[in-house]
Amino acid sequence: MNSSGKRRLACGVGAVVAAVASATLAISAASASSDVTPPAGITVPADSARGAILVASLEGRNEVTAGAPVGQALELFGIQGNTLTYSVAWRGIGTPTEAHLHAGARGVDGPVVVPLFTTPRRAGGFASGAVTVPDSTLLAALRSDPGSFYADLHTTNFPGGAARAQLHLLTHPVATSGVAALQESVVLGSQIYACIQQPDGSFAFTQHDVAAHLIGGIHHTFVQPVTGPPQWQAPDGSAVSGTVVAKNGNGAGNIAELNLDATQIGASTGLLSHVVEVLRLNTVGGVAPTGVCDPQATPIVNVPYQADYIFING
C-alpha cells in the first residue's frame, strides 16, 4: 500500500477513545448508536490463561485475492471466559457487511472460526460488540498461538475480503479499566545500517539507527545510534522508548514485525503519555544489504521501509 494513502486509526476495547485529529478513526461516545455501541469495560486478569487482549492491523494488500487498494483497519479483541469482545475502526473501504476470525497463516485463506457480525454495519467507520465462543479449545488456541488466526472485513465491493491481518497477543499487563490503541503509519522512513567489522574480520551492514516520520507528526529514531533503544516522540512532548519482547518474520525482503514493551521518557500528558506497548506491523522493505561492504566507499546506507505502528494505552 502507498503510505500516502494511510491515516491515523484509533479504537478501544473497554475504553472510549476520543478523536484526536480530523483523520482519526475512533470510537467515541458521540458516535454510539443502537447497533454499534462501544463495549462495556472488560477486565483482563493477570493470568493470561483466563483472559487476553489481541490486536490486528488490517490492510487490503494482505488479502490473498486483492482487497481494497487503500483499505486499512485496526481491531482489538478481548477474551474473558467464553466471551470475545471486539472493537474495529476502518477507512478506505465501504461499510463492512461481515467480519470474521479465520484459522490460517499469512497468505492462506482459511475457514471461519468466529463470525463477529454477518449483517451490514451502519456507516460511521467503526463497529463493536461481543460474541459467545463455547469452544474452549479454540479460545485457548487464540491466546497461545494468535499468529495462526487472522481477522478480516468484507464489503459489498470486496465480498471475498476487503482487508485482513494476523492476530497478535499483547504482552504488557493491561489495566482492568480497559485498553485502547492508536495506529500511526510511516509517511517516510529508513532503516539505517553502518558497514561494521564483524568478529571474523569481514565487514557487513549492521543496524545503526532508524529515521521515520509517522502520521500525527511522531518522529521515530534511536535514543543513541547503534545501542538504541528505539524511541517515538510526539509533537506535544510525550515520548516512549521500546524494548523488543517478541519478533516475527514477515517474508523475504521485509524487516521483522516487533512487539515492544514501552517506557515513558517524555511529557506526562499528551498523545503517547499512556502508552505501555508498541507493535511494528505490516512491514515492507527495510532489510540490510547482504554481502561484504566497504567502510570507506559506503559507510552508511539508508534503506526505505514502511510499517504501521500500534501504540497501546493500558
Q: Residues of each region from the PLM?
A:
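Metal-centered catalytic cores of metalloenzymes
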Residues: N2-C11, S31-A99, A103-Q191, Q197-P199
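Bacterial N-terminal signal peptides
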Residues: G14-A26
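Primary mode marks residue(s) on the alpha4-beta5-alpha5 output face of response regulator receiver
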Residues: L169-I192, P199-G314
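Ubiquitous "structural anchor" signal
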Residues: V20-S22, T118, L169, V245
